[in-house]
């Protein structure tokens, strides 16, 4: 994804300047929804997606939410591993999203803005040797590697889920655990009783947090 801390306070009014588009070009000519595209930009959509992944797969939630490190594909296996093994993650088996730009808003080399990835770990020496023999990019220990795809097909993949439900009576994914929640974080001063406008809106942004913290602090979930 394309993430920068300054994007967290973007609204449907400011979203197009971050994409380098005019309002006319985006909305009138292309029919793009400013609230939806703002949710991609400010982190709401990434948090919601990783919440779903965490709760469906039992992958852990980072302690302080997603950090969006700017990492190219050839560094994924070197950096998206636990801190105890030289990486950036709080845990082994944790969700995270990477950014295609750095803090200066410059594109990083070999970015994965439009793609998806997964980090894998060898469970024995044979698999480690396979990583090496197959020319896979690994961390310094040779234990971690990454698999990525340069694109994800968004709504085009929906048909697969529909086929699975209709023909096999199976879901392609469903919630099995309650590891994570999306906290509503105010974008501006709010008044008591004010109605929030959900993801990509003007009032609040979403931050991925652990379900434990959500329950302890009685966090207000982000509305979709």
Model-derived segments and spans:
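C-terminal catalytic/substrate-binding lobe primarily of soluble NAD(P)-dependent oxidoreductases
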Residues: 15-224
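A contiguous active-site-proximal alpha/beta segment in oxidoreductase catalytic domains
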Residues: 1-13
């Amino acid at each position: 994804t394309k993430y920068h801390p300054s994007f967290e306070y973007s609204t449907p009014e400011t979203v197009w300047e971050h994409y380098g588009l005019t309002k006319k070009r985006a909305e009138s000519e292309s029919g793009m929804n400013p609230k939806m595209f703002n949710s991609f930009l400010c982190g709401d959509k990434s948090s919601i997606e990783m919440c779903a992944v965490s709760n469906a797969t039992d992958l852990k939630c980072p302690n302080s939410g997603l950090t969006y490190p700017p990492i190219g594909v050839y560094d994924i296996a070197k950096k998206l591993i636990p801190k105890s093994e030289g990486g950036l993650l709080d845990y082994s088996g944790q969700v995270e999203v990477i950014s295609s730009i750095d803090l200066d808003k410059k594109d990083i080399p070999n970015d994965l803005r439009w793609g998806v990835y997964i980090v894998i770990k060898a469970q024995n020496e044979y698999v480690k040797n396979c990583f090496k023999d197959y020319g896979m990019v690994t961390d310094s220990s040779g234990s971690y590697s990454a698999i990525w795809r340069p694109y994800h097909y968004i709504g085009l993949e929906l048909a697969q889920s529909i086929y699975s439900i209709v023909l096999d009576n199976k879901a392609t994914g469903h919630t099995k655990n309650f590891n994570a929640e999306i906290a509503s974080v105010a974008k501006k001063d709010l008044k008591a009783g004010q109605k929030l406008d959900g993801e990509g809106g003007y009032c609040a942004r979403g931050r991925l947090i652990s379900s434990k913290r959500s329950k302890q602090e009685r966090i207000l979930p982000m509305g979709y």
